[in-house]
Amino acid sequence: MLCTVLALIWDENNISYDAFTLVNQAVEAAKSRPETRQQASFINACLRRFLRERAALIELTSQQEEALWNHPGWWIAKIKKQYPQCWRSVLAANNRQAPLTLRINIRKITSTAYLEQLKKLNIDARWVGGAGIELKRPQSVESLPGFHEGWFSVQDAAAQLAAPLLMRGVQHKSDLCVLDACAAPGGKTAHLLEISQCDLIALDIDAIRCERILDTLARLGLTAAVKVGDAAKPEDWCEGKLFDAILLDAPCTASGIVRRHPDVRWLRRESDVPQLAKIQSELLDVLWDKLVPGGRLLYSTCSVFLEEGDGQTKAFLAKHKNAVLMEAPGHLLPSAGEGESTLDENVSHDHDGFYYALFTKHQG
């Protein structure tokens, strides 16, 4: 309660009610509940001191990087070291509100036709590349036209690159066999099915999350073989099968999607980075053996940390001499609609942070 009211009264030029009114209401609310009644005086004292010393206290916080950027110190230090030219923009983007971006199901409707549907309802939206449409103002997804009919999914513009990247160059093959490892909740699985004709296995270690994949596919009118299993143990689910294309959206720190999951920066510990990098490396090694010669593997994470991106790619190429690195975006830093964007078609310049590396297996 104390933190909530402090946030409300922090900026005296941007509050809807008189600050003292908000303080009084907070104190009365604390008194009204047995579990907070004894803290009412403490809450009152803290808030009133803040109002008396607002300028000085805010000045103090501006001198502390953790308070200024709302990130833990180790995270700030890592971003500074890895992105010395643009670390401020990365941290600032994490503190912005993420847009509501849709991916149109092209098996059901075109982007142009869906924009017309939104226009009829006075919903302001724009095309942002590929099958992506961004709403100017977020609203309930189920209230949008065509949700129950499977016309669209919610997916960030950067995440929408995965399926086209993987399928480019292999779509022409007949009897195409594709694996989506670590597939839940199913957004990329669905996108793969929307843009190609393939026999697809969607794999995830979590049975409950696999149910979400099935629900997603059912709403969109798509089908895949959904399996519960550990991608690191293919002997339990693979049945000796090899794949023409593999998408490994690996477990990661989620350091690229902080604006969608603000708590992740405080839940993560610095020690998580090498631990997750080890898991990513193991998954890459195991799944590489399940790729046919000439096949493609797309490695992706929603992370901006180099250990989970370029560092992983360099180590993989050094270990697997039959791996050839293909053209892919690499690190996409989170962007909040300002300046240049590494997504050429994304006119909004508003997307999460991601990493993509595309490998093909040499046939020699």
Task: Tell me the role of every PLM-derived stretch.
Residues 1-364:
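S-adenosylmethionine
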